[in-house]
């Protein structure tokens, strides 16, 4: 397993699920929209929102086709809800339909051009497509929205994206901003540790990965293996061996345990 990918996949699901739930719970976020009250909801809109909530639940369970079907029914009830198109974009992206996903995000932004949640998700979609410049643009637009409550997760997603692009200095800066906003966010700590490890800053990487591994229900084979490699590179082979044995005992069938057995600390 290469260093380049070591910490990234663990945070992706965390970031995406958070974006999805925030984007569907209360409608679009951002400036320039009229404040919505209960009287603004027609029967069709209320039915559509129920469908969207169901779709979000199915999506977080990995039932993407069922989620998409619920979104389609929401759009029958009300074809002008931006959060429905936002969620449809996520579902199509998860189903490997990038053109349909792109169309859905575009439609969502036509209806709510400054919705921070859609801008975040569209930025993350572009990152997955390795369309780095577009990802940067949409993340920046999301962060510009004055009432946006998801700045930490957008900084996290931006940091992950920049790390995938190989821009480690910028990735560290984005992840550090995310950490300042949400110091308890372990997805941020994991990815910051990974970036610092790749940059050779082992002492700081050790600080962040310990925050993750000190939480037993969060630590996994990936986090333990990163910690072991950090210790090995930091000149602490005994610490690396101790973490490797913990990895082998807890996750004996993992790729990371196999890499430890082969002494592949530098791969």
Name the predicted role of every residue range.
Residues 18-43, 267:
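Bacterial Sec signal peptide processing site at the extreme N-terminus
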Residues 53, 87, 121, 155-157, ...:
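Canonical tetratricopeptide repeat
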């Amino acid at each position: 397993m290469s260093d380049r990918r070591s910490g990234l996949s663990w945070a992706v699901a965390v970031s995406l699920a958070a974006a999805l739930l925030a984007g569907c719970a209360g409608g679009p976020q951002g400036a320039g929209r009229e404040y919505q009250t209960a009287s603004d909801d027609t029967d069709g809109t209320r039915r559509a929102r129920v469908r969207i909530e169901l779709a979000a639940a199915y999506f977080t369970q990995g039932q993407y086709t069922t989620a998409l079907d619920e979104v389609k029914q929401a759009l029958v009830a009300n074809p002008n809800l931006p959060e429905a198109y936002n969620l449809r974009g996520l579902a199509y992206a998860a189903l490997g339909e990038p053109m349909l996903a792109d169309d859905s995000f575009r439609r969502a932004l036509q209806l709510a051009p400054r919705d921070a949640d859609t801008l975040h998700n569209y930025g993350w979609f572009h990152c997955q497509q390795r369309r780095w410049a577009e990802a940067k643009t949409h993340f920046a637009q999301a962060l510009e929205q004055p009432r946006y409550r998801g700045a930490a997760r957008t900084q996290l997603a931006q940091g992950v994206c920049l790390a995938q692009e190989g821009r480690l200095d910028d990735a560290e800066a984005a992840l550090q901003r995310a950490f300042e906003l949400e110091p308890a966010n372990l997805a941020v700590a994991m990815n910051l540790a990974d970036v610092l490890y790749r940059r050779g800053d082992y002492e700081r990487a050790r600080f962040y990965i310990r925050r993750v591994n000190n939480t037993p229900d969060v630590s996994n084979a990936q986090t333990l293996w990163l910690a072991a490699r950090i210790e090995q590179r930091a000149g602490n082979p005994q610490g690396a061996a101790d973490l490797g044995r913990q990895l082998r005992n807890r996750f004996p069938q993992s790729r990371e345990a196999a890499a430890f057995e082969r002494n592949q600390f530098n791969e």
